[in-house]
Amino acid sequence: MSKKVLVTRTPLGARRRALLGGAALLAGSTLPGWARAAADAAAQAGSGQAADAAGASAGSAAVSGSAASPAAPAVVGTKKVPRLLLAGPFATVSNPLIRIVDAGLLADVAEKVEFVSWRTPDQLRAMALKGEADFLAMPSNLSANLYNRGLKLQQMNIGIWGILWMVARRDGLKTLADFKGQEVVMPFRGDMPDALFRLLCRKQDIDPDKDMTLRYVASPLDAMQLLITRRADNALLADPAVAVGLRKSQSFPISVVAPSLYRSVSLQEEWGRVFNRAPRMPQAGIVMLGSQLGNTALARRFEEACEEAQNWCEANPDECGQIVARRIEMLTPEGVADAIRADKSDMVVASKARSELEFFYQQLLEMQPGLVGGKLPDDGFYFAG
């Protein structure tokens, strides 16, 4: 087949969001687009203005939170930390952070614990580079990238091992090879999901630029709109955008015109099959940074609370959906719960996940070195627990 790459034109506002989504976080690096997927999918339900307002509010809260000079780390056991700020995207990786705040799991070590959500690369960059958050959820390649470029942080854990899915109008598609000769809609060209899709295709002797028609769009919202309005048959998306979108396509009045949509190929399952490994990828986790970095007692206490919170979320998806949706208006309780049930989540301390992280990073280095900052992180990157 001849090479076919289509780029869908979108309105100015959508193109501006796409430019933000693909903008360099630091020289040579980009921000993976899955972190904004849930907000984009929810906007499909008519919450676009609420999403913009919430994103702006979160960014304002994050930036204003570090106006004062950072205080010296408090010693857990003798004095409570005055304030801890936890931050994450509109995605599953933030669930345990929200549970920690909602249940007061760190009340014994901090006077005040707050959660804020980040939506744009500018917000994440400000929070990370200025050390405004104490614990920050982000994609695992991005934390390696920032660390390799000199930012002081430590990877605490990996909690997300599988959120990328092919969504298709046709049932029965089991592997990426089944998409040969078909069009695949892809948000965020050159970003992490795109890179992983290409990597997994090429490991199976599939040239995605020749054997498929790749149609790049500005955001997951655009991809889901194309599916729901029958203008596309297949798309690569991430949870909870997948779950929210599938729920929306089955609800009135959209269900009147929307086709049946299916979770098709799990990229995590493809990863395991192609590399003969466990079917999971260390996609996202939580880092420690800011004024409390180096407070080992606090780090250990946080890790205990994070594991407890993650276990609760996995055991109580419906209740977790309720508390997450209360704090992130763009998500629905049902969509959050569906995503928890569908995806692979397992809280693993960074040092214990190191071998899987390094294998993951090595594949990205060979594919697109800038995604991880050009090298493997050293020992100081991994929290030992």
Task: State the predicted function of each range.
Residues 100-103, 127, 145, 182, ...:
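Structured segments of extracytoplasmic/periplasmic soluble domains
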Residues 11-12, 33-83:
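C-terminal segment of N-terminal export signals and the immediately downstream linker at the start
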Residues 358, 362-385:
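Conserved C-terminal helix/tail region of periplasmic/extracytoplasmic solute-binding proteins
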